[in-house]
UniProtKB/Swiss-Prot annotation:
This is Hemoglobin subunit alpha. GO terms for biological process: hydrogen peroxide catabolic process. O2 binds at H59. Pfam families: Globin. PANTHER family: HEMOGLOBIN FAMILY MEMBER, HEMOGLOBIN SUBUNIT ALPHA. Residues 2-142 form the Globin domain. One of its GO terms (molecular function) is iron ion binding. It comes from Alligator mississippiensis. Red blood cells. GO terms for cellular component: blood microparticle; haptoglobin-hemoglobin complex; hemoglobin complex. Heterotetramer of two alpha chains and two beta chains. Coiled coil: none annotated. Involved in oxygen transport from the lung to the various peripheral tissues.
Length: 142
């Protein structure tokens, strides 16, 4: 997935609104994913799945921090996400469809917290970015 200059600018603009809320937004995205797609819980058998649990908040922060790094290195997503790609493919063996589930939940979080900023163009750019991230994260599966 090729991101245009406009896409990159749009992603950086909307992501700037999340930069102070990485843990909060990350936890919310994970909670939504676990609720909407309960099969994703299989990768977290040791987690306390209750609302606002410390484990979900900590992992949500990790997820959104990784996305933050990807935004900061938007011109080199494979380089920025190489370690995570290998981890998820070889060690954790996460089913690739789960990245799409999480991407959808990330979009929902932005829609809830920043409805006026998430114009159709920004929404499309953020979706393309999350698809590009998913493609990189699944690239080591092949």
């Amino acid at each position: 997935m090729v991101l245009s200059m406009e896409d990159k600018s749009n992603v950086k603009a909307i992501w700037g609104k999340a930069s102070g809320h990485l843990e909060e937004y990350g936890a919310e995205a994970l909670e939504r994913m676990f609720c909407a797609y309960p099969q994703t819980k299989i990768y977290f058998p040791h987690f306390d799945m209750s609302h606002n649990s410390a484990q979900i908040r900590a992992h949500g922060k990790k997820v959104f921090s990784a996305l933050h790094e990807a935004v900061n290195h938007i011109d080199d997503l494979p380089g920025a996400l190489c370690r995570l790609s290998e981890l998820h493919a070889h060690s954790l063996r996460v089913d690739p469809v789960n990245f799409k589930f999480l991407a959808h939940c990330v979009l929902v979080v932005f829609a809830i917290h920043h409805p006026s900023a998430l114009s159709p163009e920004i929404h499309a750019s953020l979706d393309k970015f999350l698809c590009a991230v998913s493609a990189v994260l699944t690239s080591k599966y092949r």
